[in-house]
Each structure stands twice: as C-alpha cells, then as structure tokens.
Regions:
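Phosphate-end processing signature that detects enzymes handling 5′-triphosphorylated RNA
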Residues: 1-190
C-alpha cells in the first residue's frame, strides 16, 4: 500500500525523553517493539536514491517498506508479509511486486539487497489534536541507545507549527534527527 508520511523528528536526551514520557502519561500505554532490518544492494542504490528498504517486525505485524525521502513528505510502499516469508533474512532475492513496480517507475535497477543494519525500537504513541506524538528508544547494533521524538501529521504547515510549539513548551532545543538507518550507519563507525 502506498502512503504519504509527513513527520518531524528531533533527537532527545534521556532526561527529555523521560520528561515527555511522564508528561503524556505513557507509563501505561501500549509499548510497541519494532525490530527493523535494513537492506541495500552492493552498489548502495537505495542510499543513492534517498530511499531505505526495511523489514519491520512488531507485536502485531510484519511488513516490508520501501521509504523514499521527499522534501516535506516521504512516500512509503508498505507490503504485509506472512509466515511464508523467511524470518530475519540476510538477503532478499525476491521483492514484493509493489516494491518492484515502484523501483521500475523510478527507473532504478537493484541487485539482491543484503542486510546492512539491524535495530530495535521501543515505541510509545499518543494521539494529540494536531497529530501523533511518538517517543522512540532505539538500540542500535553496537548497543548504542538514542532517544527520539517523532510527530506525524496529515498537513505539513499545521504540523511544523505544532511540532515547534511542542518543542518550545517542553524546553527542547531543535536537534533534527536523521533517519534511523543513517544514524545506525554513523554509530557503527564509532
């Protein structure tokens, strides 16, 4: 399924994360565990086109996503995977038709994608009037943990105002978060 994603992201300190967690009373909220496996081919074609290919395992579902970065919004091609698909594969010799079609539409030729990173995120969400507030605690492959605030919205202009207000109200300096895959690659070099 093709979706448009409009989100704003900010890295947090552990204390800022804890403060927001308490302020929005997330202690008793559902905790979503995301296990993300990121893939690229030998020529780094996904990175080259500003895209990421991942398989995400959560408490409720498994899906493959092709995420294509845009200036103010991202495009996501999400394909549910069932138990017939290999669990935590290190290579993806066969991609779902929806993802192949999007790559062909973009005129991108991909070799067999190989596993490049694996991360795990503990996620809490709360719906606010202006959008969805998401707090992520992410553990990367070398046991580095970071904290992130995401704010997902349906409208860019409304979202940017609400996100900046959220940061200001909570005395959080702007510290834009790179995508998790980019942070994973950076952390792997430490």
């Amino acid at each position: 399924m093709r979706e448009i994603e409009i989100e704003f992201k900010n890295l947090l300190t552990k204390d800022q994360y804890a403060s927001l967690f308490e302020k929005y009373n997330l202690k008793n909220s559902e905790k979503i565990i995301n296990k993300n496996f990121y893939y690229d081919d030998a020529d780094e074609n996904f990175k080259r086109i500003g895209a990421a290919l991942r398989i995400r395992y959560t408490n409720k579902k498994t899906e493959m996503t092709l995420k294509i970065k845009g200036e103010t919004q991202n495009i996501e091609i999400n394909v549910p995977l069932d138990e017939r698909y290999p669990k935590e594969p290190t290579a993806l010799p066969i991609l779902p038709n929806e993802i192949i079609a999007e790559l062909e539409r973009m005129n991108v030729k991909i070799k067999t994608p190989m596993l490049i990173q694996k991360i795990e995120t503990l996620r809490c969400e709360i719906a606010l009037e202006e959008g969805l507030l998401v707090l992520d605690e992410t553990t990367f492959i070398n046991d580095i943990i970071d904290y992130e605030l995401e704010f997902e919205t349906k409208d860019y202009e409304t979202g940017v105002v609400a996100f900046e207000k959220l940061l200001e109200e909570n005395n959080i300096d702007k510290n834009p978060a790179k995508p998790k895959i980019a942070r994973a690659v950076e952390y792997s070099k430490l």
